[in-house]
Amino acid sequence: MDDNKAKALAAALQQIEKQFGKGSIMKMGDAEIDEGIQVVSTGSLGLDIALGVGGLPRGRVVEIYGPESSGKTTLCLQVVAEMQKLGGVAAFIDAEHALDPQYAQKLGVNVGDLLISQPDTGEQALEIADMLVRSGSVDIIVVDSVAALTPRAEIEGEMGDQMVGLHARLMSQALRKLTANIKKTNTLVIFINQIRMKIGVMFGSPETTTGGNALKFYASVRLDIRRIGAIKKGDEVIGSETKVKVVKNKVAPPFREAIFDILYGEGISRQGEIVEMGVAHKLVDKSGAWYAYKGEKIGQGKDNAREFLKANPEIAQEIEAGIREAASTNVIKPVKAAKAADA
């Protein structure tokens, strides 16, 4: 760049910083920019690896969607529990008015410190979310769910009134306001969404999510969660086998998948994942129904192997470290919680 251009650029940058504040524009190579992405674990080893950075990125919008009873709220509560373990502050905006505090507690959530709001309208819910984000003191906000964010005009109107596009406009306006503040305050905002069917679709998937297209664009990560099977102990169903596909990922390669078990009243089975992924990466040997690690049997059947790892956490950690290494993914440990560390 010649001297005249360099001087003109320096003057423009100085004017921008004077008008909009220091840090409003800078070079990507400047030391002030944090190169590492701060993340929080999802509570699932396989999903952390599938996300490519070791968890969900902070300072971003995340959308988790799927059919009913697929594990959307369970996954979000696991992320809340992981953030609280780091000393972070969590808020849950329960637009569905369906949060069970006892279930949340079983998943490891400190319900005594969890901020909860059960708003009357969609505008109120999103305004509360925006105020919490702008405060800079909340590390994670979960909105459950986009489908339940009913516009005020719809609530005040009559049954059967045509309210075309109201919901989509509400989401679009809210996300325009939220996004910049989310980045500045490094807050992770998770929107839970439901699936609807488009009528008359001949080709492609007829499934779509509620709330228009704005969330699809603003979300840095979109997760599609599905229940693919039941886990039984005898005739009793004790959990569900769950598959999560990373449909969109702005921080790592997308389209990776993770399969894990969600046990009722317990949440994501970390030990079950370690057993399955240990076998997949040849760290755990499987012969018939028996599982063995370093030549020693750890259990007959997956349930017994899971219980063994629960009773021997040091062995579980050793296998987990081997899995992370074998996955050869640049997994960032979710300890870079600047605000949480200051708390």
UniProtKB/Swiss-Prot annotation:
Alphabetic keyword roster: ATP-binding, Cytoplasm, DNA damage, DNA recombination, DNA repair, DNA-binding, Nucleotide-binding, SOS response
Gene Ontology, cellular component aspect: cytosol
One Pfam family of this chain: RecA
InterPro entries: AAA+_ATPase, DNA_recomb/repair_RecA, DNA_recomb/repair_RecA_CS, P-loop_NTPase, RecA-like_C, RecA-like_N, RecA_ATP-bd, RecA_C_sf
Main location: cytoplasm
Location(s), subcellular: Cytoplasm
GO MF, one example: ATP hydrolysis activity
GO terms for biological process, alphabetical: DNA recombination; DNA repair; SOS response
UniProt function note: Can catalyze the hydrolysis of ATP in the presence of single-stranded DNA, the ATP-dependent uptake of single-stranded DNA by duplex DNA, and the ATP-dependent hybridization of homologous single-stranded DNAs. It interacts with LexA causing its activation and leading to its autocatalytic cleavage.
NCBIfam families, sorted: tigrfam_recA
Family of the protein in this entry: Belongs to the RecA family.
Protein name as it appears in the record: Protein RecA
Organism annotation: Dechloromonas aromatica (strain RCB)
